[in-house]
């Protein structure tokens, strides 16, 4: 049965800073173990013909060094999603630089390792910082004006796969 300190709801404040809607749930599975499922979506089109639309799901297993929902943890995460990006250059070489009027559509799947720390703020509220690095495979299509496909290619990405500063409510 699920008891107190076994379930947490969370949101990544860094995601909100980029206008990305996001939420996650984390469930205690043992004294020092939790599993988390996190989802993010950004459905917006911005001014100046810029677009960064995507969705992402990220399951993660966590092992806590002391007790769950407090202190340091190490994790293994997976990630998968789709994107549609126009007139925006992404950091870390995620995609080749875009020229005006061109956009990328594709999907990705990957995995990585995480380190994080969770601070106890009050009986029900915590704050968490985490960073993950890993690998992602991403096939994509590059489109030009009038939706003409200019290129089909893929990226093998190695680098940061996760960054979070999360506000957490623990039941």
PLM segments and residue spans:
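Predominantly the C-terminal beta-signal and adjacent terminal strand-loop region
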Residues: 122-171
């Amino acid at each position: 049965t699920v008891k107190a300190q076994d379930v947490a709801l969370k949101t990544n404040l860094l995601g909100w800073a980029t206008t990305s809607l996001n939420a996650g749930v984390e469930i205690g599975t043992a004294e020092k173990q939790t599993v988390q499922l996190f989802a993010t979506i950004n459905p917006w089109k911005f001014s100046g013909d810029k677009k960064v639309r995507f969705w992402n799901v990220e399951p993660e297993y966590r092992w806590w060094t002391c007790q769950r929902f407090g202190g340091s943890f190490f994790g293994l995460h997976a990630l998968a999603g789709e994107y549609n990006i126009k007139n925006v250059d992404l950091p870390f070489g995620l995609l080749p630089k875009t020229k005006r009027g061109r956009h990328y559509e594709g999907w990705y799947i990957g995995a990585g390792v995480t380190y994080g720390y969770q601070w106890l703020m009050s009986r029900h509220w915590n704050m968490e910082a985490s960073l993950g690095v890993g690998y992602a495979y991403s096939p994509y299509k590059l489109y030009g004006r009038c939706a003409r496909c200019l290129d089909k290619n893929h990226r093998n990405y190695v680098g940061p796969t996760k960054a979070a500063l999360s506000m957490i409510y623990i039941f």
